[in-house]
Amino acid sequence: MSRRTYVRSERRRGCGDNLLQRIRLVVPSALQCCDGDLPIFDPQRPPARCVFQFNGEDNVSEAFPVEYIMRLMANWAQVDCDPYIKIQNTGVSVLFQGFFFRPTNAPVAEVSIDSNNVILSSTLSTGINLSALESIKRGGGIDRRPLQALMWVNCFVRMPYVQLSFRFMGPEDPSRTIKLMARATDAYMYKETGNNLDEYIRWRPSFRSPPENGSPNTSVQMQSDIKPALPDTQTTRVWKLALPVANVTYALFIVIVLVVVLGAVLFWK
């Protein structure tokens, strides 16, 4: 193996490890992480088999961020994929498995806004993929903006049963979430275009992010630079009301002049 090939393989390995590390950070510590069937290396060729597993013992009651993890996987992959999370009652614990592609004949939970509870008896399994989750959001009229309403699975393990509750939960601080999204978008735009970040932040749409505490509001400053042609005073209001009358009077004067000129021409003939 050449050095270039070795360095490239190590970079791919590190890329996959970063994804798994992010997933471990958002999963509750009560769910133990296990290795998947195959390691992940190349974002352009994600494996079809299980890439991570989380195991929860009896009497565990935790919330699993299924949508956030699936979107992490979809953003990491550089090809079209439909991430799938499988949830299985093994008889002694609950098992969460992650796939970049839904396996053949893998079950999908029939949940909706009104019906979101699933009970698994021993050895039964269910799951959800990103496309099905998007359909649920569209059908229920849920906010589809990033990080505004994310699906979590509340898992209650009471053997021999596992009770699952698929719920959408919003951020605790919506304004802080909007600020974080604006900063992430600014960093991405700076990385893609290479333009001046301060210049982009100055001219970005004002609705994307509220101003920081103590910092000047850029949108207000931009709007204050645009001054009206005439100040809205009592005199200008009277002038605006008089404009239609003046236009009518001027037109009538033109008509009278034309009639007089035509009469004079006919008279002198």
Curated annotation (Swiss-Prot):
Entry GO terms, CC: host cell nuclear inner membrane; membrane
Top-level taxonomic group: Viruses
Modifications after synthesis and translation: Phosphorylated.
Record keywords: Host membrane, Host nucleus, Late protein, Membrane, Phosphoprotein, Transmembrane, Transmembrane helix
Perinuclear space compartment spans: 1-247
Annotated localization: Host nucleus inner membrane
Parts of the chain on the Nuclear side: 269
Membrane protein topology class: Single-pass membrane protein
One Pfam family this sequence matches: Herpes_U34
Membrane-spanning residues: 248-268
HAMAP family, sorted: HSV_NEC2
Subunit: Forms a heterohexameric complex with NEC1.
The family this protein is said to belong to: Belongs to the herpesviridae NEC2 protein family.
Function of the protein: Plays an essential role in virion nuclear egress, the first step of virion release from infected cell. Within the host nucleus, NEC1 interacts with the newly formed capsid through the vertexes and directs it to the inner nuclear membrane by associating with NEC2. Induces the budding of the capsid at the inner nuclear membrane as well as its envelopment into the perinuclear space.
Name of the featured protein: Nuclear egress protein 2
Organism: Varicella-zoster virus (strain Dumas) (HHV-3)
Recorded name of the encoding gene: NEC2
